[in-house]
Amino acid sequence: MIDVNNFESMEIGLASPMKIRSWSYGEVTKPETINYRTLKPEKDGLFDERIFGPTKDFECACGRYKRARYNKRVCERCGVEVTSAKVRRERMGHIELAAPASHIWYFKGIPSRMGLVLDMSPRELEEVIYFASYVVLDAGDTGLEKKQLLSEPRYRELKEEYGNRFTAEMGAEAIQKLLADVDLAKEATELKAVLKEATGQKRTRAVRRLDILEAFLKSGNKPEWMVMDVIPVMPPDLRPMVQLEGGRFATSDLNDLYRRVINRNNRLKRLLELNAPGIIVQNEKRMLQEAVDALIDNGRRGRPVAGPGNRPLKSLSHLLKGKQGRFRQNLLGKRVDYSGRSVIDVGPSMKMNQMGLPVPMAMELFKPFIIHELTKRNLATNVKAAKRMIDKRDEKVFDVLEDVIKEHPVLLNRAPTLHRLGIQAFEPILVSGKAMRLHPLVCAAYNADFDGDQMAIHVPLSDEAQAEARLLMLAAHHILSPRDGEPIVAPSQDMVIGNYYMTTEDKAREGEGMIFKDTNEARMAYRNGYVALQTRVGVLTSSFDKKPFTAEQRQKIMVTSVGKLLFNNIMPEDYTYINEPTADNLQNGVPDKYFLEPGEDIHAYLENAPLVPPFKKGFLSDIIADVYKIYKVTVTSQLLDRIKDLGYYESTISGLTVGIADVTDLKEKPEIIEKAHKQVALVTKQFRRGLITDNERYERVIGIWNDAKDEVQNKLIEHMDIHNPINMMSDSGARGNISNFTQLAGMRGLMASPSGKIMELPILSNFREGLSVLEMFISSHGARKGMTDTALKTANSGYLTRRLVDVAQDVIVREKDCGTDRGLEVTAITNGNEMIEPLYDRILGRYTMKSVFNPETGEKIVGKNVLLNEEMAQKIIDAGVQKVTIRSAFTCNTEHGVCERCYGRNAATGDQVEAGEAIGTVAAQSIGEPGTQLTLRNFHTGGVAGNDDITQGLPRIQEIVESRNPKGKATISEVTGQVVSIEENPAEQTKDVTIKGETDTRTYTLPITARIRVAEGDDIHRGRAINEGSIDPKEMIRVRDVLSTETYLLSEVQNVYRMQGIDLLDKHVEIMIRQMMRKVRVMDPGDTDVLPGELLDISQFRDANYQTLISGGIPATARPVILGITKAALETNSFLSAASFQETTRVLTDAAIRGKNDPLVGLKENVIIGKIIPAGTGMGAYRNIKPKEVSVNTGATDGAITSIREMEEQLKDQD
């Protein structure tokens, strides 16, 4: 076997007949498979042991030689080589065809490759190949033309007239001869000459032909190889035949297809020997051609060959295609050993880096480790005895199991794996039962809940795999989401309500105004019932020796609540005391207003002091983010566990319950509804009198009922008791929101009909009163629509993610600094007056390209090439800076990736990104993962004329990344100048906008409903939209430059996500857009070898020009193109990646003719061939590291190494 990790690249080409014969171990001449009585393979048949190898390990067919000692011996009696039966998976055979057959991929594909080489149309080719017409091979002196088609009667006439002065033939044989006659170099030269004059259709055809001819010239493939004299036969174990119970056989479809080819081939041979009449031979040749076509790609031409039950047979092409094909099913998605799956259950008592593993699963997963340990400890004499012990569940085994799983991390995965946090590592803890236990805080990352979800578990085997799982994948490390750098692990549900209840303050609770010397004294008073958690008390500030209070504050008494004292007790010792849920408290410590001078009357203070709001879910997240920033991973994960334990404990003790009595009645509801009814009656009256249109009436009625619902909601909030458990639940962010409460206690309001239009009939009841039958029926429409939408959205979003990953999978951080001198000037993204993305979010975690100066004073805030952290970014914003030039993926010069500087900070760790990080995949997942939260529908903008439905949500994202013509397209100005006139033309229902540029004047005609964005006298830049709507990026890239198009697309994507409240970092979107813009189309090839109209990577284009300029030639010119992600993924330099994505046969056909070489740069192609991926520790720099013993010093840092870089630093120090 070849070692996959040792080769550089992989090449594909056309197989010559000699090559096919060299692969083969013998010719298959009989259609037989296996003998039905003996079940042994037939001689010379499709399963022959002489050709393909023995069916039993080291045993020949007749049984003369058995055992491995006869290895490689060929039996004299039966001719079978004695070797491992595995060879039946790799040995091929061949079939010598009695007449050549064309390969359907090259004849039928679009464009037809044979047609382009011969300059014949696919229709003409089909007539020749399938024996409908003759083609002239040699015209002699007859005045016919070469390649001219002749019908059967016409051929006979000419034959009588000219005899043997010309030759014409039919079938693939004729095409093979024509292909062999083509002088590639001569044709290519002629075409190049044609290209200089030709235009239009003729030019396009010439370019395509030249492209194919050049491909044959460069690759060394010969055109005649597109017609086959011999076809390979696949190894038998890859097209098996198995016996079912009842004596029937199940067989792979390929065997049927091969059998048809062999049968027809043998019949043709016999007919040729018998000198049968031409028409019979011709018919048999045509049938052989059709059999070969069906074998290669059944159904591509004519009706597919069907098997039993009229099911089309699966041919060789079908084995590769689609989700169930070889690429996606077996090469990209293998099933692995040492894995299992089970239902998950909650494990609230575990630490963040642990999971509960059921004993029976652990026994099976760690079996080899247990066996090894049992024999090592001499508890079992050999492997067999050890296995027996495990099967009998011997109690010694359990002790060994405990030791084996200690310190051995396992990986847990939940499908669908939408982002990289869908697989995390944990340390297993043995638990009883059959369900795996999952830590409650990692549920958010997995999107898991415990209503029957299942998860898969995998055991990393090698030491390196275990080390990576522990250092890089441990769940405790994954605190920030790679999408936006915010914490993804946050307390939820019970934990939130527990901490909320605990940090609530109440007036006049028992023991109010007591003053304690420290937290412990307060805890004792609480345990003994002198105070409640919600009691406001004083405590000596000086008792907190490590908390960062000011010297002044340390002399005073701080007013807080007992619950808050206990809450702060679980925080890191030197972390700020948290007394109110504000960012100010986190950044600058407890405000001075909470401190009393010793001797001041605390009761008087409490009389007037307002109650401080409790800590809600969002604030707990802020605390976690802040702690992470200061203390990094270890401390944060420990804190998270403490918050979790405290939350569960306190929510249990609080005794919060929900009953029907907690849903209060609203006294004002009847009069609000009465008022609304009157307004509706008034509007209807106006409509009947013809004062308003039906549309206006509808809009107003909807408006009236929405206002009524809002009023009910506001009244409910006013009357809401802060101790109401339902209110506490929604206010804390544990579950539900105010609209749920409105539906329980107020009114349900308006519902959507099945068409999505809002019905005028409101649901006046709430769930507390109960709905009438009609109301119930109406509201069921909306519920059903919600369910179907979600299902559709999931599929759409999943497919989007797949395309995004495919186009960006080869983008990896390749180097430290690409040395670019270009940057991206960023400002806040706004839409009208609405802030979409503030400048702070756009510059945080990025490198500056130029120094940033204070616009008022002119002083330098930060220099160039500086990574902006929170503090610096805030400084820039505070100084009133509007524009900052940053390093960006758009302007990065690194090939096949991005450099560390242009990428900036890794959102998932909060540190500078490291070389080897697979940022392309992370970017794709970050954009795709929230896809299910985006809406599927277009928003109907309340009937405002002209502003037709703006595409939003998922459809808009697809429109952008596939660079389709947008719905509601805006017209853009092609000149820079001034708007001189805007004229309406009512007769033709249009508006004409005239813009006077520096050189010419343009007039744009828009529909009369269009909302114009400019006014007369306005200055306008080229590429700016004249009316409301989305700009077509293809037009923009034509009129403006690449960078402004990229910037526009970035702001459009952000617009969609931020409108839905989803934060997404710019850098992810930048990477995707850069992948769409990486190609240029050659306009004029100059003196280079490239072809006009060819798509090239920018780097390839630059290299071609560089060589030409050095030798003093004229360089080529090209213009940038924008490709949709599907097209971009198919245009990648890796044919393996493209073929495994979509249109497998087309990609492979093209790659074979061009003799493409796959450099194995991306992740996908390396996974396909089983090579370690060139990202992370698989990068060249990290390979071939020799292990070295190091003394472990325990008193070092907090012990947790969080990145490879830290590991390297430590090793350096020890050297």
From Swiss-Prot:
Zn(2+) 2 binds at residues 818, 892, 899, 902. GO terms for cellular component: DNA-directed RNA polymerase complex. Zn(2+) 1 binds at residues 60, 62, 75, 78. Keywords: DNA-directed RNA polymerase, Magnesium, Metal-binding, Nucleotidyltransferase, Transcription, Transferase, Zinc. Binds 1 Mg(2+) ion per subunit. It catalyses: RNA(n) + a ribonucleoside 5'-triphosphate = RNA(n+1) + diphosphate. Mg(2+) binds at residues 449, 451, 453. SUPFAM superfamilies: beta and beta-prime subunits of DNA dependent RNA-polymerase. GO terms for biological process: DNA-templated transcription. Its cofactor is Mg(2+); Zn(2+). Its EC number is 2.7.7.6. It is an enzyme of class 2 (transferase). GO terms for molecular function: DNA binding; DNA-directed RNA polymerase activity; magnesium ion binding; zinc ion binding. DNA-dependent RNA polymerase catalyzes the transcription of DNA into RNA using the four ribonucleoside triphosphates as substrates. The RNAP catalytic core consists of 2 alpha, 1 beta, 1 beta' and 1 omega subunit. When a sigma factor is associated with the core the holoenzyme is formed, which can initiate transcription. Belongs to the RNA polymerase beta' chain family. This is DNA-directed RNA polymerase subunit beta'. The gene is rpoC.
